[in-house]
């Protein structure tokens, strides 16, 4: 295993200086890497060049579905009662060898911009504490497997970035970082139409009509359609004509995973602790926080004074 003092992780002055300061002060040189998922391809390539082992990791891509919050409670007993909290749901459907499922369901929420690179569009969802927005939204995504890219992490990263660039180009007519969108029925029929009625888009950079199916590989688009049709049988009104799909969601989790040992330390580079979403060990805020806590405890326990 290589020592971090002999092999800089990246050409980042701040991170390299961090290691050097720890070394000179006599403190252990430990550097957790807790990147948000969807990090730059260049950073991952540089890590591979420095002997950090990176694997292709299963992830998902899809769209955000927006519908009135009242409809989000459809099918629930006493839906709309003031004593009840905002309705939530979690759905999944196997379609052939893939799975379509909902992710990041946000009652009373909105769709937000989450791009981390220029010339790319990424959507995400959130709710404020009161969950008082009139819309409910959730990502509807389809699984992407290692076999889709011959288990090559570089191909997986390139695919993710290609989709984000397509989304940017499709929404560009409405302004920088506007998102492509269409009504859910339009998506099911492959029409690329957007009519704004009772449901208004919440993506604050603006939206424009686009054929979302054309932004995805045909197999993934068809799988999403099959999943949405199945959801209509589980929640009546799920594919209501006024529901809006906003795209794309490409970062439910990282397309790669940095290899680490049972003690959470990087296999090839001493002192490096991959953790969280970007490293491929979480898929959301809570799971990333829990993984970060586990890594922190591992580092602390390694240097904690012996009891007694």
Please tell me what each predicted stretch does.
Residues 1, 24, 32-308:
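Residues forming the flavin
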Residues 16-20, 53:
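Residues flanking N-terminal targeting/processing segments that define the start of mature chains
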Residues 12-13, 26:
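Intrinsic disorder/low-complexity segments enriched in small, polar and charged residues
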Residues 5, 11-12, 36-37:
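Polybasic, lysine-rich low-complexity intrinsically disordered segments
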Residues 4-9, 28-31:
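Intrinsic low-complexity, disordered N-terminal segments enriched in polar/charged/small residues
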């Amino acid at each position: 295993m290589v020592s971090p003092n002999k092999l800089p992780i990246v050409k980042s002055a701040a991170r390299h200086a961090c290691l050097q300061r720890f070394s000179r002060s006599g403190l252990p040189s430990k550097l957790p890497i807790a990147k948000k998922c969807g990090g730059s391809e260049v950073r991952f390539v540089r890590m591979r060049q420095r002997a950090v082992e990176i694997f292709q990791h299963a992830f998902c891509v899809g769209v955000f579905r927006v519908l009135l919050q009242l409809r989000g409670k459809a099918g629930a007993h006493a839906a709309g009662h003031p004593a009840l909290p905002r309705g939530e749901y979690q759905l999944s459907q196997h379609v052939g060898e893939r799975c379509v499922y909902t992710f990041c369901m946000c009652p009373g929420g909105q769709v937000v911009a989450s791009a981390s690179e220029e010339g790319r569009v990424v959507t995400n969802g959130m709710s404020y504490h009161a969950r008082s927005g009139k819309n409910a939204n959730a990502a509807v995504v389809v699984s992407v497997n290692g076999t889709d890219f011959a288990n090559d992490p570089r191909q997986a990263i390139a695919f993710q970035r290609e989709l984000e660039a397509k989304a940017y180009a499709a929404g560009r007519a409405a302004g920088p970082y506007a998102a492509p969108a269409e009504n859910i029925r339009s998506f099911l029929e492959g029409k690329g139409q957007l009519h704004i009625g009772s449901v208004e888009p919440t993506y604050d950079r603006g939206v424009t009509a686009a054929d979302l199916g054309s932004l995805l590989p045909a197999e993934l688009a068809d799988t999403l359609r099959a999943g949405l049709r199945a959801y209509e049988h589980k929640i009546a009104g799920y594919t209501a004509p006024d529901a809006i799909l906003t795209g794309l969601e490409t970062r439910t989790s990282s397309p790669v995973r940095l290899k680490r040992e049972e003690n959470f330390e990087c296999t090839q580079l001493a002192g490096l602790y991959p953790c969280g979403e970007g490293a491929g060990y979480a898929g959301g805020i809570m799971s990333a926080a829990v993984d970060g806590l586990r890594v922190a405890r591992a580092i602390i326990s390694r240097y904690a004074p012996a009891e007694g």
